Amino acid sequence: MVKTIENRILITIGAITFVESPDIQRLAADRDEVIFETLPRGRTRETIVRPNGVQVVTVRNRFGDIIQRSRILPDGREVILSYAQEYDREDYVEWRDPSFDLPPMRLTIPVREYTLDARYVENDGDYYDFLELPPVERIEKVYSIQDVKRSARVRDKARRVEMGNITFGFGSADIAEDQIPTLEGLAQALSRLIEQNPGETFLIEGHTDAVGLDGANLALSDRRAESVAVALTDVFGIPAENLATQGYGERFLKVKTQSKEPLNRRVVFRRITPLIAPVASAQ
């Protein structure tokens, strides 16, 4: 089942509803032009050309799923950000949760080594030290962006940074101006990692509390993730294509309550490069 809410699409697969939103507006905010091409088998290619000569190229299948996203540098070099070969198959029909093929998650490290709470970070360098750590499980295959966004089991292979120092007003996706500086330490870590590997991708997860309708909360959480991504790009210069966003509504509450709870209105960061990039996965 598919329906729209607040310029976003709600897709129900089985018993779970996901929110999807086009990221072209965020990626193309600073561009000279955007070129759309139709390819064989219903595929499309979207090329964003920036004033500095950089091109961001996204190829999608007939369902809109991302097959490949690359950054083409002015000298012609290509940086692969993600590549999902299975989405390019002619017999591909619908998404299947890869968690069906995985055993239950067993965390074999202390929780403090799996989750970093930004509220207790004393040294900004801790963000870098944490994000450069490998996934907590072996990566069996190269996953797609959609796999990581939609499957909690796949996503949980990557450690997470809980940005508890950024909260949102009830029903709001706006970041308070006095909270923007709290992103600086994280932004420095992202910049450093991207400088070392321009193909890095970081997922920003948006969340809400449990008050309100599920669909509205999915859309709201997606806008929260997008707001943080825009701030990282506009204020700290993090390339938009190195950031992916996804809203999860009230599905993953930090505080188990059905009441209004600021700690549940939050964002979470994960470095998902090893899950979606062929070279990183091989390593």
Predicted regions and their residues:
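Solvent-exposed coil/turn segments that connect beta secondary-structure elements
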Residues: 14-16, 51-53, 60-64, 72-74, ...
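Short polar/acidic secondary-structure junctions
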Residues: 49, 195, 259-260
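Periplasmic OmpA-like peptidoglycan-binding domain that tethers envelope proteins to the cell wall
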Residues: 178-180, 205-283
